């Protein structure tokens, strides 16, 4: 194809991690699907990723190098010079930053501007910290915001401090958006917010391609564990796990055998090491779980590979996304690809991914409605498969690898001036 593209990534793609470790990489992420497609097109790629490791090559056309991992909300001016050097050496036709929620994105914007390459740079909007910060603590009572554990005291951390960090990341994000000429987005929400910050932006629409395993497989009611709810995260407040726990307690009044499964480590562990590692939000979830008598109803699944995650989707009766803010959550797309019935809070860009015929959208921060809709899916029994099938049809269109690759290459050609 004769095009040189520089990628700036928040995390190393699985192929890079595998090259660094010398072992097959089990934790392949969604970016690997795009990377594989681009490598097959003969694009010369330079991948800069946040992390550690020795610079190297995946093949003659694809090289990689680490970017020092420092706090996401503190700008590092020295990165600008490092990026200017990268731009001088590689001379990319296109610069693509996958996300703008880390400080290194602004450093690349500034480096590209000083090198006269800003018109050839595009940034994909993943989440928008400047908007997420506003909803970080939605649904949390005052007593939860005041909780601080030993770990929080030692690290000078708290839920409110985490919200402040998101706001600071958002300030850097806004600076990047104000300077950029081009962004890639995929929802009505990210388009409206990006253009509100910088009306002069050229907004390019391009959906995301998800991890390969989720394109194969079909949810079946007969094969699932009845009344089992699957959620994707309990790690921080914006994912809304506190709301889902409250909803679960209501669901169990009608379905006493209802359970909730979630990836990650248990916040219910009572050993000393676990208690010392616990942050304020986890501590609140612990007390909430005990208060609602849900200790035996919540299952923690630990770290899951893509294949393991897929298995959990297929074993569940419903996928629930209770987040207080999202743009286009990949976990929802994965559930839809498999045809799993979904209930999601109607926040951010979620409605651009799933309509009411393809799933159930709830009002944000409404535990009563969340519980009602989960019960509705349970009551549908095998009839819920029709809704799941509609979701699958929609997701196969949204996350179509061939169509998304074509759109991305068209954007690259436009920016590079190599449209023919």
Where are these regions (language model features)?
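Nucleotide-activated donor-binding/catalytic signature segment of Leloir-type glycosyltransferases, i.e.
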Residues: 274-304
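Conserved donor-binding/catalytic core segment of Leloir-type glycosyltransferases
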Residues: 6, 220-239, 245-250, 260-263
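Aromatic "clamp/platform" in nucleotide-sugar-dependent glycosyltransferases that forms part
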Residues: 324
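Short hydrophobic beta-strand element within catalytic cores of glycosyltransferases
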Residues: 341-344
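Short alpha-helical donor nucleotide-sugar binding micro-motif in glycosyltransferases
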Residues: 87, 311-316
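Conserved acidic donor-binding segment of nucleotide-sugar-dependent glycosyltransferases
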Residues: 356, 360-367, 376-381
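Membrane-proximal helix-turn-helix segments that form the acceptor-binding/catalytic region
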Residues: 33-34, 129, 145-182, 192, ...
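N-terminal subdomain of nucleotide-sugar transferases
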Residues: 1-54, 62, 116-117
């Amino acid at each position: 194809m004769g095009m040189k593209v520089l990628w700036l990534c928040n995390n190393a793609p699985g192929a890079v991690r595998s090259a660094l470790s010398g072992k097959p990489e089990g934790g392949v992420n969604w970016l690997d699907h795009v990377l594989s497609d681009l490598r097959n097109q003969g694009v010369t790629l330079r991948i800069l990723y946040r992390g550690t490791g020795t610079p190297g090559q995946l093949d003659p056309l694809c090289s990689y190098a680490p970017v020092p991992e420092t706090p996401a909300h503190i700008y590092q001016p020295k990165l600008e010079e490092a990026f200017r050097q990268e731009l001088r050496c590689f001379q990319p036709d296109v610069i693509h930053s996958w996300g703008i929620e880390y400080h290194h994105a602004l450093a690349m914007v500034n480096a590209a501007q000083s090198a006269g390459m800003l018109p050839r740079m595009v940034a994909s909007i993943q989440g928008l910290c400047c908007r997420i910060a506003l909803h970080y603590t939605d649904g949390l009572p005052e007593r939860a915001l005041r909780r601080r554990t030993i770990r929080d005291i030692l690290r000078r951390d708290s839920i409110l401090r985490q919200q402040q960090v998101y706001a600071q990341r958002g300030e850097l994000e806004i600076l990047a958006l104000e300077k950029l000429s081009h962004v890639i987005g995929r929802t009505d929400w990210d388009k409206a917010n990006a253009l509100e910050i910088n009306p002069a932006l050229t907004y390019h629409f391009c959906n995301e391609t998800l991890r390969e395993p989720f394109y194969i497989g079909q949810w079946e009611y007969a094969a699932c564990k009845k009344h089992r709810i699957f959620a994707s995260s309990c790690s921080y407040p914006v994912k809304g796990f506190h709301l889902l726990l409250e909803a679960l307690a209501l669901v169990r009044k009608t379905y006493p055998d209802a359970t909730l499964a979630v990836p990650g480590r248990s916040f219910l562990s009572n050993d000393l090491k676990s208690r010392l590692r616990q942050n304020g939000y986890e501590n609140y979830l612990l007390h909430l779980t005990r208060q609602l008598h849900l200790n035996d109803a919540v299952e923690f699944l630990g770290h899951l590979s893509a294949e393991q995650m897929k298995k959990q989707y297929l074993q569940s009766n419903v996928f629930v996304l209770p987040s207080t803010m999202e743009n286009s959550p990949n976990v929802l797309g994965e559930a839809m690809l498999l045809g799993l019935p979904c209930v999601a809070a109607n926040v951010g860009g979620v409605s651009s991914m799933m309509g009411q015929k393809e799933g159930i959208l709830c009002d944000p921060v409404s535990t009563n409605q969340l519980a009602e809709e989960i019960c509705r899916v349970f009551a549908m029994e095998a009839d819920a498969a029709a809704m799941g099938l509609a979701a699958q049809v929609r997701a196969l269109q949204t996350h179509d690898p061939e169509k998304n690759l074509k759109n991305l290459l068209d954007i690259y050609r436009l920016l590079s001036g190599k449209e023919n």
